[in-house]
Every structure is written in C-alpha cells, then in structure tokens.
C-alpha cells in the first residue's frame, strides 16, 4: 500500500521512524488504560453524569410507561426513578439445557 508522509514523499510502505514508534507505544498505553478503566467502572462513583446524550445512568430520565393494553392508565414510574446509579447485580435465571432449546437443525431444512 502506498504511504505519503507529512513532507509529501511517496513510500511503498510506511517507514519505521521515531514518530511511528511513539504512536505505537501511545496506542498500546491507551488501550491498556481503557481496559483497566472498564474493569474498574462498576466500582467507581463516576457514572458518566457529564454525558448529555446518555441521561443519568440506567434509565433514570423518564419512568417506565404504565398502562397499555385495554384502557391505558397513568404513566406509572419506578420508585426513585430520578436517582440514576448502577443497578444491583441480579441473577437473570438459569441457563437452559441444550435439549430444551427450540431451534432448527444445523442446516435449517425441514
């Protein structure tokens, strides 16, 4: 692949210079940093409150819609819906054994 450097020279491939080595180590540093930040995210108090697109955490912006079905009803809401924060760790349920899964055979032909 052709590479054009910052001086306008055309190279067959990108040369190994000081800038490329520094970029490589900085990239590795930020990747390791982000990895550990994601490991520690549940234990920190920062819940991305400064991000205006995400609201405030786990759906703290509006309550859960209520009613529905036959006649509607008022918009219910969870208790403490404006608090934000992380949800508690809950068990989803047990993993079903393979024999109870309803899926087609390998080819999907019937």
From Swiss-Prot:
PANTHER family: SELENOPROTEIN K (PTHR16875:SF0). It is a single-pass type III membrane protein. It comes from Drosophila melanogaster. Plays a role in the life span. May be involved in regulating the redox state of the cell and possesses anticarcinogenic properties. The chain crosses the membrane at residues 21-41. It is found in: Golgi apparatus membrane. Residues 42-110 are cytoplasmic. This is Glycine-rich selenoprotein.
């Amino acid at each position: 692949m052709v590479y054009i450097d910052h001086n306008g020279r055309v190279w067959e491939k990108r040369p190994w210079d000081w800038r490329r080595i520094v970029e490589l180590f900085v990239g590795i540093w930020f990747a390791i940093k982000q990895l550990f930040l994601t490991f520690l995210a549940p234990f920190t108090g920062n819940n991305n409150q400064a991000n205006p697109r995400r609201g405030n955490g786990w759906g703290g912006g509006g309550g859960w819609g209520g009613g529905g079905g036959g006649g509607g009803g008022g918009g219910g809401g969870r208790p403490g819906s404006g608090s934000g924060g992380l949800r508690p760790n809950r068990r989803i349920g047990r993993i079903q054994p393979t024999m109870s899964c309803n899926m087609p055979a390998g080819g999907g032909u019937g």
